[in-house]
A protein has these predicted regions:
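Short linear sequence motifs
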Residues: 4, 89, 116-119
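Sec-dependent N-terminal signal peptides
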Residues: 4-13
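Long, amphipathic alpha-helical surface segments
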Residues: 18-37, 41, 49-84, 101-151
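Long, amphipathic, charge-rich alpha-helical segments that form helical bundles/coiled-coils
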Residues: 88-102
Length: 151
């Protein structure tokens, strides 16, 4: 019995550490692609946070504040997709860039809701800027998918 309890405790800890390391990897990936926004990118501050009505963040925030804001935003995005289980982080990262509504209404989310895990092409399809394929966005989507998708 003790061995079983020990195994369950170790498994729970390992799962939590794995989830934390995936979240950390996701945050670092976002930071790499977003970069720390300069004042001329207003209303975007930090690592791509769009200022909301009533928020008083300054456009010249330091890296520590920007990092904390990114993590808080990403956690909020992941909570929106908690019903998607292990895919909540993948969808949260995408929503960080394009918004929750677009992700929730997408064919990607529909396929996952229906149990279809063949979603690579749908995920990478979020690579357009003004209707044209962006090589940088395509690279970002491929990296996000490789990093966060677990089949």
């Amino acid at each position: 019995m003790r061995k079983v309890l020990f195994f369950l405790a170790a498994f729970s800890i390992a799962s939590a550490v794995h989830s934390q390391s995936l979240f950390e990897a996701a945050a670092q990936c976002i930071k790499r692609y977003e970069g720390l926004h300069a004042p001329e990118h207003y209303p975007y501050v930090g690592y791509g946070h769009r200022l909301l009505a009533g928020e008083a963040f300054r456009s010249d925030m330091n890296e520590k504040t920007a990092d904390s804001l990114l993590r808080a935003d990403l956690l909020r995005k992941c909570r929106v997709f908690r019903n998607f289980g292990k895919d909540s982080l993948l969808l949260g990262v995408l929503a960080y860039n394009i918004g929750e509504t677009k992700v929730l209404k997408s064919r990607l989310a529909g396929k996952l809701r229906n149990g279809d895990r063949d979603i690579y092409s749908e995920y990478v399809s979020f690579r357009l800027i003004d209707g044209k394929v962006s090589a940088a966005l395509e690279k970002r989507r491929r990296e996000e998918f490789k990093l966060l998708f677990n089949d």
